[in-house]
UniProtKB/Swiss-Prot annotation:
Gene3D superfamilies given in the database record: HUPs
Residues given in the record as ATP binding sites: 30-35
GO biological process: tRNA wobble base cytosine methylation
Recorded domain comment: The N-terminal region contains the highly conserved SGGXDS motif, predicted to be a P-loop motif involved in ATP binding.
InterPro entries: Rossmann-like_a/b/a_fold, TilS/TtcA_N, tRNA_Ile_lys_synt, tRNA_Ile_lys_synt_N
This protein's record includes keyword Lipid metabolism: no
Nucleotide-binding found in the keyword field: yes
General function of this protein: Ligates lysine onto the cytidine present at position 34 of the AUA codon-specific tRNA(Ile) that contains the anticodon CAU, in an ATP-dependent manner. Cytidine is converted to lysidine, thus changing the amino acid specificity of the tRNA from methionine to isoleucine.
The protein's name: Probable tRNA(Ile)-lysidine synthase
Subcellular location: Cytoplasm
Family statement drawn from the similarity comment of this UniProt entry: Belongs to the tRNA(Ile)-lysidine synthase family.
Organism: Schizosaccharomyces pombe (strain 972 / ATCC 24843)
Amino acid sequence: MDTIKLKEFYNSLVSIRRRVGHRRLGIAVSGGVDSMLLSWFMKESQIMFGWPNQFIAFVVDHRIRKNSTEEALQTIWNLNRMLIPNVYLNINWGNDDVHSLTNLETIAREHRYQVLTRACITHNIRHICTAHHANDQAETIFMRLLRRKPGTWGGLCAMKPVSQIPESDSICGASNIELLRPLLPYYKNQILNTAKQHGIAWEEDPTNADINLTPRNAIRRFLNQHAALTVEATKLATAFQSLQVNIDNKVDEILKDNIVSYHQPSGTLSLCFSKNELKKHSNLTKEELLLRCLTLTTSCRQIKRSSVVSLCNSVFDGKKLTIAKCLLTSSSIKDDTKLQLQISRQPFSKAELKKKTITINPDRYVLWDHRFWIKYSCKNTQTTLILRPLLSKDLNSLKGFLSKEEFLKFCIQVPGHIRFTIPVLSEENDKLVGIPTFGFNFRSDIISNCLHKFKL
């Protein structure tokens, strides 16, 4: 009988241990055999090897099926029996008719990760483990093969052992949380055999066997009947992940040698490349380089790799372009041997200006333009302010608030259109109160704060 030994599992945690150190770990527990075995392994690793020294299991009640709460409470009982600390969480669907949603699987996934993210923030947890395994990886590969566009490959990396927690970029603090998958090297039959060997109790979700419910269920049934394909799919994911690591390392080297400046208050990136050096790099490397640079400036939730692929050569050929709401301006310098590239936020359209003007309350972070988390504190807690882009009419007011030297420095740091893509706080009569990304506060009773969503 093929099982997973405790030492084997612990060895797969070694690289994770280096990342996590002595911080508390979280575990996402559905109650199924995968997450219950993961919880058991964590407890046994703590007893036998002294790590993790602290962990907590988060039991998520999805509230989609009538008996889901009963199953969640049974899972908590099973965890308590193993002396595993746990917290009950549930998804609040509000007035939504869950079963009328055509994309229920996707929405449920989003809600689940958001609930887990908030729990991690509440419990000061930076790393949470899920029980994804090799069969899940194979299913993901087949899902992406069915959906991907010809000529793209990024999605074929599938699930990585370590990644940022997904579906939670609208939650302040989510970017600090990593998702760990220590069971990814192991197959479902190994997990089942190991759980049975150690007498671990779990709950079965009957909907997982309904091939008419979701595409993933149908793919799971197909792969169960063709075990060899599961192995080949996981090998494919491993190969693409190795390719991604090699490209990432090259991009790291290029950025280290070629970044001129990254102005965080405006999210503007300036680089300078040797044209001869650029020619030596593959298209894949240049595409990943551009994608990495764009993520530091974009206001898009996701950047389509296809848009980067189609325009990559034009960018490095010195053309002015817009990609993913970023303006890319390049020029040749030093006898045409070098290429200088600046990436900044694309100027707002009239429609965007309206959307980017919002009323906010004190002491609560608000994500603005998907780039900056803005918050302000005020002695009068009833005070509401307007969060909006800087406008040309604000410059005269700004001259009155800043010294001549400060105003000149500000204009140099954010020249031209760039200055009109940064956020300001104002009263309802448009009187400036502050510029949070620069740390400017123009009212003594108000202090603004900014967290930058993207960091170099």
